[in-house]
Amino acid sequence: MDTSQLLTLWNDRASQLGVVDLSLLGVGAVIAFAWLFSGGKKARTPPGPRPLPILGNLLSIPTTHPWKIYDKWCRDNNSDLMYLRLPGGNGILVLNTMKAATDLLVKRSTIYSDRPQSIMLSDLMGMSWVFGLMQYGDAWKQHRRLFHREFEGSTAVRMHAQNAARRLLQRLLNSNVNYARDMQLTTGDMILSATYGITPKSEDDYFIKLAEGLVGALAVVAGGGFLVDLIPPMRWIPRWFPGGGFKKQADEWKGLGVTARSVPFNHVKEQLANGTAPLSIASHFLAAHQEDDESTNESKEFMQNILAEAYLGGAGATVGTLCTFTLAMALNPDVQKRAQAAIDEALHGERLPDFTDFGNIPYMDALLNEILRWHPGAPLGLFHSSNKDDVYEGYLVPKGTFISPNVWAILHDPAVYGEDVDEFRPERFLTKDGKRNDIPDSEIAFGFGRRICPGRTMGRDTLWITSASILATFDITNPVDKEGKPLDPASIEYSNSMSSRPPYFDCTFKLRSKAAEALVRNGLNEA
């Protein structure tokens, strides 16, 4: 295979992974190959597919359902681990079992709590403020501490989540429902209202679109979409030079990041100044920090970061999980009926669910766990990174290795969850008399160890109140594909992205009764 063929193969595969500009001409090619041939550690790394010269396992990285393909490889080879070599000497270590993920990401968290560093993201896009992607260290700890202090136990979060769910119910009265757009709006409504006191009116709202654009950019970069992150010397390519188009893209996305971080925060500051700021996490924080000293200004800067990250995070995984809920209910009417019966038994059809019911309807708790288990929003999690060489089970894990926990595989382990792991069955989390059993819940859908998602409580709250509110008042029926035919479960292919979700399908949201309609129409008056 000659040089031109290798470059063609590289470009073909990278373009499938979402690369924006892959021209490697002239000096770009020289830089690339100088870096590729720089070599890496020659040691006994964990098992994996046989690598190619130069490209490593780049062509082995699947573009559809990688979580299933990695799981099959590990099971076929009786291994908890799978190692993929990348060009330039680095590699990806897939952890396919709970034992491997716990051993490394929890028990050895001092080694495996870093995130891979992206030149595109941090240096060129200027998004080092995203604390979920920061290196493990003092800055990350300060941000996480502030997040917990301001978000955990905040009355604003649950109040706005409940109101957003009830606004969704009123939109579902419309016969021309596009549930995916409505779930997008509901999630944005909940998070923007809770963080900034901003209530978006439609899915075309400025802040909703801003979050969508930036989340899309983050997904491309985090998915390894730019050669500059594999070949760092490419950062010196001028913008005007062939192959330098990634810098123009970085400039555009950098502007989105600046806007997302500053505009809504300054909007709340203006509202506070004129006395019109509604209750939100931002208004509560700013009201308590009106001094203008160095310590307060640093806290305000950190707060800008975590507020922006909160609404960016919700624009991704939470939407996908709500779409999975819709799909599961449409495909499993018997499960839907059992969940509705459990809600009816608790509420007697007299009111809508609220957070006083949270934890008091065991079937709904089981349903929530099953939604997160059946298809987690991030099937391969977010990459961790090793901060030094380590040895595990006799294998070298080199410093800088990308660590990918196969969350989907762990939550589909037949030894834990039963042989019917591909079925949607909330009862797997319940005893025969309807109480919680000892099967592990689906908390790992939110991550592992010190890098577990800080917004997981907010995510669970949003999923619970939204799904319970819909089930109390609507039947989800008649799922059909884009050709109008009954939806075939075997044809469903989740997106291969940082926040995975099912393809769109049409379905009907039908009011359960006249009494349910009255609850929907009066819901916001009761909030």
Swiss-Prot record:
It holds the Pfam family p450. Its EC number is 1.-.-.-. It is found in: Membrane. It catalyses: cyathadiol + reduced [NADPH--hemoprotein reductase] + O2 = cyathatriol + oxidized [NADPH--hemoprotein reductase] + H2O + H(+). It is an enzyme of class 1 (oxidoreductase). Heme binds at C453. Keywords: Glycoprotein, Heme, Iron, Membrane, Metal-binding, Monooxygenase, Oxidoreductase, Transmembrane, Transmembrane helix. It comes from the Eukaryota. Pathway: Secondary metabolite biosynthesis. Its main location: membrane. Induction: Expression is induced under erinacine P-producing conditions. GO terms for molecular function: heme binding; iron ion binding; monooxygenase activity; oxidoreductase activity, acting on paired donors, with incorporation or reduction of molecular oxygen. The keyword Metal-binding applies. Glycans are attached at N77, N274, N297. One of its GO terms (cellular component) is membrane. Its cofactor is heme. The chain crosses the membrane at residues 17-37. It is a single-pass membrane protein. Belongs to the cytochrome P450 family. Cytochrome P450 monooxygenase; part of the gene cluster that mediates the biosynthesis of erinacines, cyathane-xylosides that show unique biological activities, including leishmanicidal activity, stimulating activity for nerve growth-factor synthesis, and agonistic activity toward the kappa opioid receptor. This is Cytochrome P450 monooxyhenase eriA. It comes from Hericium erinaceus.
